[in-house]
Amino acid sequence: MQEKISKFEDFLTQLQQNITTALEQHETNAAKFISDKWQKPDTPDQKLKGYGNSMIIEGGEIFEKGVVAFSRVHGSELPPFATAKRQELAGKSFIATGLSLVIHPRNPFVPTSHANFRIFIAGADTDNPIWWFGGGFDLTPYYPFEEDAIHWHQTAKNICDKHDKTYYPKFKKWCDEYFYLKHRDEYRGVGGLFFDDLNDKSFDECFNFVTDCANSYLDAYIPIVAQRKNIEYSQKHKDFQLYRRGRYVEFNLVFDRGTIFGLQSGGRTESILSSMPPMATWKYNWQPELGSEEEKVYQYIKPRDWIK
């Protein structure tokens, strides 16, 4: 099992380099991803041990902020959040390896994107370890274009159909349901793919699906960035982007499994919260004008069949 974990780690660290390099090619000023390598001290008082590399870009003309973060951590006991629905895992040691990214563009016409790919092994130090994969990618437009959502979902469907034709409808529905702000009765964006507890096939089959899915992120996102990054925008457009970013913050702090797991398990706070946007606003009881571009967004970011 250790050999398989290391193979996935090697894949993720290479993917991290591929993604940051591809995104930098679209940046028009001197902004670059900086590498912040870290390691948790192996001391008795540390609940979580391990290491990682958070790659951050800030202040770009195209990407106002972005993070592509790799981590490999282990602990003696899964935190309560991770075992709430799987009591058989309570008290088990664990290893978690993953890559998580969030890209916040400056231009309101370029959507925010998020992706995450990970493996968990519970009881890795026992004769019967329990493994599963999780991950996916989703898109959060501020001023959406239907063709962008279609391209995003078509890319997702193509990669799913290559492995299992039941995956896309199942993981799309899961994504729609997961990225939902219950307290606002709003969806975060136009969705994509979300899956967890993936071990329905052999390890190698699941590994191949997850790595193919991870490799398709750039195919899904880069064409959208290229198409929208030079659209002129006004302060009104920027203000609405900042307002909608507030919803992104709310979701990450209240509902996001990765954030909650990281904080409960004693993870590296600076890396966990690096996905937050550089700026966001909240307005009391704000409502968009009837018939405005902003009002149309709320009708757009609802679950639908993007691929006819």
UniProtKB/Swiss-Prot annotation:
Keyword vocabulary terms for this entry: Cytoplasm, Heme biosynthesis, Metal-binding, Oxidoreductase, Porphyrin biosynthesis
Gene Ontology CC annotation, any one: cytoplasm
Protein family membership: Belongs to the aerobic coproporphyrinogen-III oxidase family.
Biological source species: Francisella tularensis subsp. holarctica (strain FTNF002-00 / FTA)
Gene name of this polypeptide: hemF
Subunit structure: Homodimer.
Binding-site residues, a divalent metal cation: H104, H114, H153, H183
Gene Ontology MF term list: coproporphyrinogen oxidase activity; metal ion binding; protein homodimerization activity
Stretches for region Important for dimerization: 248-283
Family matches, as NCBIfam families: PRK05330.1
InterPro entries attached to this UniProt entry: Coprogen_oxidase_aer, Coprogen_oxidase_aer_sf, Coprogen_oxidase_CS
Protein's name according to its UniProt entry: Oxygen-dependent coproporphyrinogen-III oxidase
Any one biological process term the GO annotation gives: protoporphyrinogen IX biosynthetic process
Active site (catalytic residues): H114
Compartments in which it is found: Cytoplasm
